[in-house]
Amino acid sequence: MTTKITLKLNPPHNGRYYTEDDIISGSVVLKLAKATAVKQLRVILKGTSQTMTLAEADRHSSRLPQDPQTQYTKEKSTHILFHQGVQLLPPTGVEDSIKLGQDTYKYGFEFRLAGGPKCVSGHQATSHSFLEDKAHEHYGEQLPPSFNDRHEGGGVTTEELFFYNLGKVRYTVRAEADVATGNKWAPKSPLHDTMVISFLPLQCQAYVENACTSAGSDDTLVNYTALPRTYRAAADVVLSDGLSVTPEVRSNALAYVHRLDYLFRESSGKFGNIFMVFSGDPTKHSVKLTRLVLSLHEKVSFTANGHTNKNLSQLKLMDTPLDDELQLRDLHILEDGSREGKLNLGDHPVLSRLRFNEEDYIHRGNTLFSFTTCNIKREYYFQLDLHWKVDATAVRSEIIVDPVTVYAESAPPAFEGLPPYPEKPPKYEA
């Protein structure tokens, strides 16, 4: 039998990750091989956000950045998001160490991860925090989610993955025991056991009323009654006679997306309303949609001491061949003489079933969600590519929807009101 300490955690309520509504509880098991004096037994819950950035000017080597022969300038940043301890021994009011006999001892504890980042109150004007941006200031009111918390850099084989792993948000529970070794204390190397926990706050799971606004936009993230917003293609398509055509997406709910949201159904408020707008009468032409590609782009930024690195990646959500010819004689004529026609994609056998992130995709070790904290910012945008055949000429149009706030869980059910009361309320006489 050897003296050791073991940390045991009760699983989160959902079995996957803790939220600010969960009580993080567990026990510390202290096994003593012989009678021992215990100076202190404690449990610490700590959250940190760490980044390292590399100067672009020094990245001109064929070697991987982690190669010791690669020369670069690096900056580091560490923010303490949360730090709370629970003392288990000695009991409250007892200052001296406690002598315990050879045995196994078990002590319970509990925490709650709530509130905003602890470090925010100490930010200086020169701290270069992403939270200083008004578009992200609401994130400072709540703790950020775990991110890259299971990576230690081992096994990284590409430059792309190396840079992606230079930022992390990690929450740990650590049990420590200061015990006597012979006639001496060993405070610099106490017995300890540490566990990494996964934390995902409610603001990253699904929209919370009045809690968030779209990054870089004044639009409310979820507003089912909002007027449609128009997202136009980056460039017009000019036909042989000088007539121009512009694809547009009109949506009141594309500033955000939940997991399992339908993307092309008209009722979803996403890509269900795609229009072609012509500058004049196009009836002499033929326009056919031949292919549709939808991608989600991720932008992850790390900052440290005023230097910022950005990591870009792309996830293809859908690539579907089509053969839909636009009926140019049925276009709606607008007041300015332009004409528009809607693409009827909601009944397509593939597009009508397409739901966002149905497979609960893990991207580089993380589920898909947006967040911003002091030194890390994770953002997304949609790219819709429409491939046409205009008068037998192949044409490609690109529509960008930026930014898009991505939520990790499905949308909460719509409010349905209270059920009707089946009986008449009683009458009381004075």
From Swiss-Prot:
Where do the segments described as Disordered lie? 55-75
Function text? May regulate endocytosis by recruiting RSP5 ubiquitin ligase activity to specific plasma membrane proteins in response to extracellular stimuli.
Can you say what this protein is called? Answer: Arrestin-related trafficking adapter 10
What family classification does the UniProt entry report for this protein?
Answer: Belongs to the ART10 family.
**Localisation per UniProt entry:** Cytoplasm
Composition skew (Polar residues), residue ranges: 63-72
User: Where is it predominantly found?
Assistant: cytoplasm
What CDD domains does the annotation carry?
Answer: ART10-like
Q: Which UniProt keywords apply?
A: Cytoplasm, Endocytosis
Biological source species = Eremothecium gossypii (strain ATCC 10895 / CBS 109.51 / FGSC 9923 / NRRL Y-1056)
Report the GO terms under cellular component.
cytoplasm; cytosol; plasma membrane
What InterPro entries has UniProt attached to this entry?
Arrestin-like_C, Arrestin_domain-protein
A biological process (GO) of this protein is: ubiquitin-dependent endocytosis
Q: List the disulfide bonds.
A: none
Q: Which GO terms describe its molecular function?
A: protein-macromolecule adaptor activity; ubiquitin protein ligase binding
